[in-house]
């Protein structure tokens, strides 16, 4: 159907009763852009095509059924003719027409003017034609000419109209040749019998081929697309004579099945530029069509005598012999008798490189269907190929089957139409399968064998088979595994010697012409190999063999081992625990070394097990690496960080917060005491600092009183807690180093703390009054840690002091003030308070108590604040003097009461305007804090639990299971902290549940199942809990004082210990006489001290040496058995296992008693 003013190609072909290819070729001649049978064109373009075809046909029919049947009859006769012609052609010499080197190396355009040599060949062909007497010559050459020359004849009728200059130059010669050929051949010869070995009888064949060509005009797209081949046919008309005389021609490899490439736009453009196209009139297949000008044809090609159906293949055909005008192409006699070539315009002809008459090429054998053993099986008698668009004679295209079929792959509708038209024309040959290359030819020689790699063509069946009329079978054959068929054909095409050197030449250009009207197959062809190649590469890239994997692993292990040979100077432990693998990485050791070290210390561990800080320090010291606790590498939330944009207008200077750090033996505490005592003499009380860990002093500097806030960090407890929370409250760090000891591991730790807080460091070199003090040595050691003194050109202030003699204390304070002034410390006292919790504890009378350091704003009594996950409302505040105050400004330490729980040291606190807002924030923080704490507790217990399991296997482990319930979370944490301080060498305390609140029935059930004791601290029992405890025999202990609770728990732990057996002396006796009784003996003794008891243990001493130790089995006094004998009495002593008594032996009587063990032992 037409679309507005347009018409489809297949509609036009149906109207004109032509093939789609004919219409597409005509459109290409007229430069009308159409791509496939479904492309549309304007009605004007359609009229042009109609006029072109009608003018070319000159009123003749395109195809008739009678010609198809006539063609089939000719094909049967040609089989016999081919065999005879082959035998004649073998006896003819082939070397007469060997092209010159110059002409072989020179590869002209396909439409090349006929040279002299070709003219001579044409004239010789004419002579041969004149000799023919029989109108039906059996020769293959005549058959080839009959299928090619009429087309050429028809085209020469229009050479006067052509725009190609080459055609005009050669038109005279071609017209003459046409006349000679037509005069020698009748118009239509239907004679079924032909003389057997008449090789040069062209006239009959010419006439027949003219009719055949007219019948196959629909299929003659290749002729129109490749006018160059017609020129070759024309120029090669004189070749048959020499070919017949050349015996090698028969076996010359003919490039009949050359693999055709997909159409390349560059090749196509070159083809259009280089090929001198025929005018539109050349499209029509006239029965009297002469050889196309400039198309050199080898009419007498003895190497392919039996190839029928060549008339429709202008590029191939009878005249494909030596190809004299193909420069550089030797004789390739391996494909001599390939039939069905003339209908392939892009391959046949004398100018085709790698053509059958390549001189010097050996015979290619091994293809069964090549006559004489030298013919390519897949190319000999391929007939009726729908791609070749030939008449029913069974002519086969000369290109490689896989290439051409993929190029000419059409959709289903095209295939049906082409198959239908071919079937109507031939009646005997079914349409060819789309993806299968023709495997056998109908007219193959009797001795030809079928190549197993070739797929069957439509003529592989006998003509007239009724089963080929079934369209379903045809469709099934067309769609049957085309990829495999293409692969098979492609392999044969690659092995074809006639294609290897010339596949990139004119054959490629001809392919582009053949596929000009079929864009879809080209797409499939180009995409399939690419996708396969990509997939193959992807799989190959991602696949790693076992050998490669082992090699890569070995290289990685070697590199890791090389990297671990350098030991670090120190290691930093994050959050006080590391796994074995992490510790090995930090120490640059193998994990097996760490496990071995732990094993020798009695600890069984795996690479994923966590180690506590003490264990890490022990292992690291063994390898000579000091251990430092990790600093949280995040910005310190100092006062300036707590200042908001609204505070800028109200900022004032605030006192600095100074933290004193250093090794415990370097006088840190003494220096703090010295500063406090000097201020006490001035009337400033500082006793409160013993409780809150922070205090504030005044110092006169430049006639002004300056306040300094000192943060006491004994044992690094408060400071470590703050670092763990990522909070830094220090403005200036004072590093105390002993002049007689130098830098110690804790000194390095203090430096690390200060650097993590990003605060300035002031070094106090203490103990300068002692003998052996060397401040310069301390400066040298500190310079190695990048702390360079000012007098050495650095920026670190170092002050030599003596805490005992109070030397340079004022100078130290002055330097601290100078450094703090450089820091420009400011705060806004008019806003709500923000700060940090320095210390927190649970007081018996006051409840949870926290020491707060206000960093910004003013803290007032009654404020609602949130400290971490703890909510509080300030009920009272106490300053460093112990006085109650109502408010505290920036940098002021206070002791605050009123928290719901004991807050965590190091948490930040912030005052909120109302309690509701504070509660919402506290609830979110509490959830996160509990999850974090649980993870830390589980991590810290891994090693101890592992070692405990080993002890339990040995029967040495005792456990006390507890369930702890308290009034508030602060009490729970305080009790848990105290329990951690108890000795755990032999008895472990396992707290299965710890939570604030009352004791419930659920707690009773858990205790009954686990055998635990319930500890209640300042809490009560829920209803029903007491009854459940009595029924389950669960022990509940309630306490109000933490000390009593800890004493009872310690006593319970000691009760789990095995008691000690202690030897207790009873008395001593001396042996004064012996009496033999039966087999034994009795010793008469005198009790010197103490007493003897029956069944007690005794020890016999002789000359101060123990000769026997056992039990006292018999004790008598005057023949009476008694239980004991006291001092001053005589008695008889008998032992079952000892009878060698001597006078003077000493008997020591004793017994073993149990003694309760304590946890301290």
UniProtKB/Swiss-Prot annotation:
Ranges where the tr-type G domain occurs: 653-830
Xref: Pfam families: EF-G_D2, GTP_EFTU, IF-2, IF2_N
G5, as annotated region: 802-804
Any one GO molecular function term: GTP binding
Region feature (G3): 712-715
Binding site for GTP: 662-669, 712-716, 766-769
Coiled-coil ranges from the UniProt annotation: none
Chain intervals with Polar residues compositional bias: 139-154, 295-311, 352-362, 380-393, 440-461
Region of interest (G4), residue spans: 766-769
Annotated keywords: Cytoplasm, GTP-binding, Initiation factor, Nucleotide-binding, Protein biosynthesis
Stretches the record annotates as G1: 662-669
Sequence ranges of Basic and acidic residues compositional bias: 83-105, 164-180, 211-220, 412-432, 464-478, 543-561
Alphabetical list of CDD domains matching this protein: IF2_eIF5B, IF2_mtIF2_II, mtIF2_IVc
Name of the protein described by the UniProt record: Translation initiation factor IF-2
